Design a protein with these regions (language model features):
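Short, well-structured N-terminal submotif of metal-dependent ribonuclease cores
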Residues: 1-28, 43-52, 120
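Active-site neighborhoods of divalent-metal-dependent phosphate/nucleic-acid chemistry enzymes
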Residues: 63-111
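Short loop/helix-cap segments at secondary-structure boundaries that form the rim of catalytic
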Residues: 114-120
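PIN/NYN-family metal-dependent endoribonuclease catalytic core
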Residues: 17-45, 60, 64-70
């Protein structure tokens, strides 16, 4: 959602921007780092300057970054393994499990990850 909200050229930009603007969103710390990485590595002309990507994250999410302790993340791997979560879905599971642990709603346009989010007990709002 954050990449789409920050990127006027993105197909889900309007829905993502509106979803963020309608609330006081938080962001999973890992997802913030992924967002910064994605925004600053896009091919030109869509690539953001690092300072611009940081400003976006600061403006939209301020001090509302959430995350799990290292010990909690370590324990998650057992849950992921038992649930059959592996590969790239592991990162979706981390985001979902973090929002679930915080009692937050995960706002996403990523239909691909919905099963993974359900497996870790995330409350999900699908946008777009």
């Amino acid at each position: 959602m954050a990449v789409a909200a920050a990127s006027p050229w993105h197909e889900n930009h309007e829905a993502a921007f509106d979803a963020l603007a309608a609330s006081r969103p938080g962001i999973v710390a890992h997802a913030a780092v992924e967002t910064y990485s994605a925004l600053t590595r896009m091919p030109e002309p869509n690539r953001m300057h690092p300072a611009e990507a940081l400003l976006f994250l600061d403006d939209w999410f301020e001090d509302r970054w959430i995350g799990l302790s290292a010990a909690a993340q370590r324990l998650l791997l057992g849950r992921f393994s038992a649930a059959g979560i592996h590969g790239g879905a592991t990162y979706d599971a981390l985001i979902g499990a973090t929002t679930a642990a915080e009692g937050a709603t995960l706002v996403t346009a990523d239909r691909r990850a919905l099963v993974t989010y359900a497996l870790v007990g995330a409350d999900v709002e699908l946008v777009a």
